[in-house]
């Protein structure tokens, strides 16, 4: 094969392995790196199993999670792949979005079929917005009976359909991660087939820069003779000088204003883009008209809300969370982007209480409106200490 130099122009996609314990997620992750290393040695280092298995700890929204990150390239793409050692780590990662996934490889053992955690991961993927799934039917070398393989495949497709994924169309590839890792050529080829399916059916994500402008306000100050400046990190989109923007959230009404200047590191710019830390000079706005916790956005792109449904993970006491359960009408603070807002919790029908370490659905009513859309993530705090994390699954009011 001709030498290829690393092309930064390749599209970048974030994926991860999900599925039941011991169905082979970590083995598959290692095997993918091996097979791609063998196919494109200049592009891919091989990452052995034990290196992925002892995943380093990270913090996301005050929650500690073990996540292993590996990267590799196919012919057409560059991938960042996440794998979590424990079931709880998966749940925490998916809810906090510590490692965002543009798509997932659902690993199902052909010897067991879908198991309880298979279902839980698929449900979470649906709720937290993992948009695409490809199935690796693993340990296929251990099943001689073609009919059994077909039945398991059917079961997986039905499971995906029941959670509103396109079960009939999702690629299902029969693999043996262990055999591929051991260097078996035929099973290695099946993994290349799996990655071709990932290339093909997990589309490129829309880049932050292409989405409507949004910047959470971190600080507000006055520059004598020039006006009010708000600072923050642009979360998405682009803001240009002389554009009209809206200030949304916290206060009952949304305010419209014009950006008369964009500054970064004391220099004047024409625009601020996703990822930039900038100061925006706003026309006709008084210091007391804006506050931390509001967002500056492209007009009409987002609205303020107080009532929503969410999927949450509640820390256990070893993670620094609560020592006792909570009940309906629990009133913690919900930390959105840059600020805390108190909210009242309603639990789902039939749920009396939520124990530390649980993940659950809930409805929340905030005492102040927040610029909100489905998919927005938050932390749950009591007096500045994180006790949980969640994601808005549905805006109600």
From Swiss-Prot:
Q: Which Gene3D superfamilies match?
A: P-loop containing nucleotide triphosphate hydrolases, Translation factors
Q: Coiled coil: which residue ranges?
A: none
- Primary location group: cytoplasm
Annotated region (G1), positions in chain: 19-26
Residue stretches making up the tr-type G domain: 10-206
Compartment list: Cytoplasm
So what EC number does this one have? Answer: 3.6.5.3
Q: Write out the entry's keywords from A to Z.
A: Cytoplasm, Elongation factor, GTP-binding, Hydrolase, Magnesium, Metal-binding, Nucleotide-binding, Protein biosynthesis
Q: Which residues bind Mg(2+)?
A: 26
What disulfide bonds does the UniProt entry report for this chain?
Answer: none
Supply the Pfam families for this chain: GTP_EFTU, GTP_EFTU_D2, GTP_EFTU_D3
One term of GO molecular function = GTP binding
Q: What class of enzyme is it?
A: hydrolase
What's in the GO CC field? cytosol
Query: What the protein does?
Result: GTP hydrolase that promotes the GTP-dependent binding of aminoacyl-tRNA to the A-site of ribosomes during protein biosynthesis.
PANTHER family in the cross-refs: ELONGATION FACTOR TU, MITOCHONDRIAL (PTHR43721:SF22), ELONGATION FACTOR TU-RELATED (PTHR43721)
Q: Which NCBIfam families match?
A: EF-Tu (TIGR00485), PRK00049.1 (NF000766), PRK12735.1 (NF009372), PRK12736.1 (NF009373), small_GTP (TIGR00231)
Q: Which family does it belong to?
A: Belongs to the TRAFAC class translation factor GTPase superfamily. Classic translation factor GTPase family. EF-Tu/EF-1A subfamily.
Q: What is this protein called?
A: Elongation factor Tu
């Amino acid at each position: 094969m001709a030498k290829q130099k690393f092309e930064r122009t390749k599209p970048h996609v974030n994926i991860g392995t999900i599925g039941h314990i011991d169905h082979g997620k970590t083995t598959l992750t290692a095997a993918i790196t091996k097979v791609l290393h063998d196919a494109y040695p200049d592009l891919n280092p091989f990452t052995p199993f034990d290196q992925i298995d002892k995943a380093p700890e990270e913090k996301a929204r005050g929650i500690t999670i073990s996540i292993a990150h590996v990267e590799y390239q196919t012919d057409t793409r560059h991938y960042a792949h996440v794998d979590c050692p424990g079931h709880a780590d998966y749940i925490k990662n998916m809810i906090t979005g510590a490692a965002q996934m543009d798509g997932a490889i659902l690993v199902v053992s052909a010897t067991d079929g879908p198991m309880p955690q298979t279902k839980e991961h698929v449900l979470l993927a649906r709720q937290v917005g993992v948009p695409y799934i490809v199935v690796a039917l693993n340990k296929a070398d251990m099943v001689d009976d073609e009919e059994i393989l077909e039945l398991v495949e059917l079961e997986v497709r039905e499971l995906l359909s029941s959670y509103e994924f396109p079960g009939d169309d999702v690629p299902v590839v029969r693999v043996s991660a262990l055999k591929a890792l051991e260097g078996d050529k035929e099973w290695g080829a099946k993994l290349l087939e799996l990655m071709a399916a990932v290339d093909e059916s997990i589309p490129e994500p829309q880049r932050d820069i292409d989405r409507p402008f949004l910047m959470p306000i971190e600080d507000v100050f006055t520059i004598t003779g020039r006006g009010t400046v708000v600072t923050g990190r642009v979360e998405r989109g682009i803001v240009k000088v002389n554009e009209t923007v809206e200030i949304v959230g916290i206060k009952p009404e949304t305010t419209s204003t014009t950006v008369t200047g964009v500054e970064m590191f004391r220099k004047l710019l024409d625009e601020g883009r996703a990822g930039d830390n900038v100061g925006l000079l706003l026309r006709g706005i008084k210091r007391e008209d804006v506050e931390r916790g509001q967002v500056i956005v492209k007009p009409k792109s987002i609205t303020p809300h107080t009532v929503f449904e969410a999927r949450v993970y509640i820390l256990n006491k070893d993670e620094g969370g609560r020592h006792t359960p909570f009940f309906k009408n629990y009133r913690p603070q919900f930390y959105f982007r840059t600020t805390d807002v108190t909210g009242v919790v309603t639990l789902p029908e039939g749920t009396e209480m939520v124990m530390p370490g649980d993940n659950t659905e809930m409805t929340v009513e905030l005492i102040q409106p927040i610029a909100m859309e489905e998919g927005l993530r938050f932390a749950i705090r009591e007096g500045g200490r994180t006790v949980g994390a969640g994601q808005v699954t549905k805006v109600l009011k």
